[in-house]
């Protein structure tokens, strides 16, 4: 095969021309003198049509019948070079069709495990390396790619510098009970939960920084929203106020949604996502409500017929049902701000005049997707941070570099983090986070 290849996504530019595409066969149908071949090449899906009389006319009866028979006997996931004339076809769900003039098999495929019938989740996860080839899984990966692309674009446009934090660390950024421990030349080390502590050092040097990479949480959770390994975007910035931080977070999430609408509209169509809802999340302002007001709202509505959550008192943390109700009540992504210090991280700065609450926010996505962003202002006063660590019984020697940041020109600063998989799940409208990452790592799954 010496002809120049084109991608399926570009066929609209070649109407009336003969092209060659490298692709995999996803399905075939037809009978008698006609064969339909469903194709994919990673960029999009497409249909080719082969007519027996055309093959006989072009190649002669013996060769034409032989070539046509090869097409009729194609198996699912056989890889091929297929040549044909691109034609517009309003009847086709693709808008275009390929009038096949030649086909060459590259790699055979026999007894492909994932047939068009329904399969159980465990079977599909055991064959994740193959399940990724399906239309919906490819669509989710395209949305993931669009979100990652939009992340880099947004932070570049807003003056942030990419700042890489280490994967191995000797201390915890969050809950120390959720750490994966490993041996580091005879000393204990831990897989990173977050790059935040190191990003704060970056913010003191470069002003605005962000990190994007894998993080690890040893949570023994089986919910549809948790992974033990996932990709986190963390951002840190100096000299911004709490309200300015919320403005930045809102702009970022809206940029991600817009990025998917711009770069992966066909993926949203495949997943049958409510695009009008996504557009509304861009145009309407996000809601902001204090933790205490949210608790009061929950208490006022807990007797409603359509509620399904446990009673909470002021000082209690939300569960998933509470987060779902809050975001659905407002109908748009909702910031819950100023949580109790009692169950938030040691580094969060107290609300001025109210040390029981901290300057933080969780962004809750509507439609039942829950928290997608967590952020806060950081305690920038050395003495106050030391006092908090002493109160919690923390070993300050493990955080000497972090405390140094408060000793040499400390400034007001804050940051936030977003689990990319949660954002992908929300924008794609999928039911489980395991589909938002190529190879999910969960409580009872570490392969393939």
Swiss-Prot record:
Q: Supply the enzyme class, top level.
A: ligase
One example of a Gene Ontology biological process annotation: asparaginyl-tRNA aminoacylation
- Catalytic reaction(s) noted: tRNA(Asn) + L-asparagine + ATP = L-asparaginyl-tRNA(Asn) + AMP + diphosphate + H(+)
Q: Which InterPro entries match?
A: Aa-tRNA-synt_II, aa-tRNA-synth_II, aa-tRNA-synth_II/BPL/LPL, Asn-tRNA-ligase, Asp/Asn-tRNA-synth_IIb, NA-bd_OB-fold, NA-bd_OB_tRNA
Gene3D superfamilies found in the cross-reference section: Bira Bifunctional Protein, Domain 2 (3.30.930.10), Nucleic acid-binding proteins (2.40.50.140)
Q: Does the keyword Nucleotide-binding apply?
A: yes
- What keywords are annotated for this sequence in UniProt? Aminoacyl-tRNA synthetase, ATP-binding, Cytoplasm, Ligase, Nucleotide-binding, Protein biosynthesis
Q: Name one GO molecular function term.
A: ATP binding
Superkingdom assignment = Bacteria
**What compartments host this protein?**
Cytoplasm
Q: Can the keyword Cytoplasm be found in this entry's annotation?
A: yes
Instruction: List the Pfam families.
Output: tRNA-synt_2 (PF00152), tRNA_anti-codon (PF01336)
Q: What EC number(s) has UniProt assigned to this enzyme?
A: 6.1.1.22
List the record's Gene Ontology CC terms alphabetically: cytoplasm
Q: What does the subunit section of this Swiss-Prot or TrEMBL entry state? A: Homodimer.
User: Which family is annotated?
Assistant: Belongs to the class-II aminoacyl-tRNA synthetase family.
Question: HAMAP family in the record, alphabetically?
Answer: Asn_tRNA_synth
Q: How is this protein named in the record?
A: Asparagine--tRNA ligase
Q: What organism, scientifically named, is this protein from?
A: Streptococcus pyogenes serotype M12 (strain MGAS2096)
């Amino acid at each position: 095969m010496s002809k120049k290849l084109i991608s399926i996504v570009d066929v609209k530019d070649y109407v009336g021309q003969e092209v060659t595409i490298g692709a995999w066969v996803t399905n075939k149908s037809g009978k008698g003198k006609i064969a339909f071949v469903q194709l994919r090449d990673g960029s999009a899906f497409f249909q080719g049509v082969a007519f027996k009389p055309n093959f006989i006319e072009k190649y002669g009866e013996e060769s034409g019948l032989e070539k046509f028979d090869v097409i009729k006997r194609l198996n699912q996931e056989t890889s091929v070079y297929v040549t044909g004339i691109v034609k517009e076809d309003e009847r086709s769900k693709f808008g275009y069709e390929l009038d096949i003039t030649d086909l060459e098999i590259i790699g055979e495929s026999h007894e492909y495990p994932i047939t068009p019938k329904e399969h159980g989740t465990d079977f599909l996860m055991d064959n994740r390396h193959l399940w990724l080839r399906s239309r919906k899984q490819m669509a989710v990966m395209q949305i993931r790619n669009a979100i990652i692309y939009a992340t880099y674009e947004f932070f570049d446009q807003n003056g942030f510098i990419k700042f890489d934090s280490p994967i191995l660390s000797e201390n915890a950024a969050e809950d120390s009970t959720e750490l994966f421990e490993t041996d580091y030349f005879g000393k204990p080390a831990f897989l990173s939960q977050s790059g935040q502590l190191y990003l704060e050092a970056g913010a003191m040097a470069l002003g605005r920084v962000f990190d994007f990479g894998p993080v690890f949480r040893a949570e023994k959770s089986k919910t549809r929203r948790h992974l033990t390994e996932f990709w986190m975007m963390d951002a840190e910035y100096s000299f911004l106020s709490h309200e300015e931080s919320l403005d930045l977070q809102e702009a970022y999430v809206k940029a991600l949604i817009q990025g998917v609408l711009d770069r992966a509209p066909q993926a949203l169509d495949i997943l049958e996502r409510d695009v009008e809802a996504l557009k509304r999340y861009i145009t309407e302002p996000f809601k902001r409500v204090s933790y205490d007001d949210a608790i009061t709202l929950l208490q006022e509505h807990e007797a409603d017929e359509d509620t399904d959550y446990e009673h909470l008192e002021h000082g209690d943390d939300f569960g998933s049902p509470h987060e779902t109700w809050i975001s659905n009540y407002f109908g748009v992504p909702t910031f819950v701000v100023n949580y109790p210090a009692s169950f938030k991280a040691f580094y969060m700065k107290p609300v001025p005049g109210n040390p029981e609450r901290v300057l933080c926010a969780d962004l809750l996505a509507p439609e039942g997707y829950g928290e997608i962003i967590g952020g806060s202002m950081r305690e920038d006063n050395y003495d106050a941070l030391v006092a908090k660590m002493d109160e919690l019984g923390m070993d300050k020697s493990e955080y000497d570099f972090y405390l140094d940041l408060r000793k040499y020109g400390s400034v007001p600063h804050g940051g936030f983090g977003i689990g990319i998989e949660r954002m992908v799940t929300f924008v794609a409208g999928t039911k489980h986070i395991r589909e938002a990452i190529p190879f999910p790592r969960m409580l009872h799954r570490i392969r393939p």
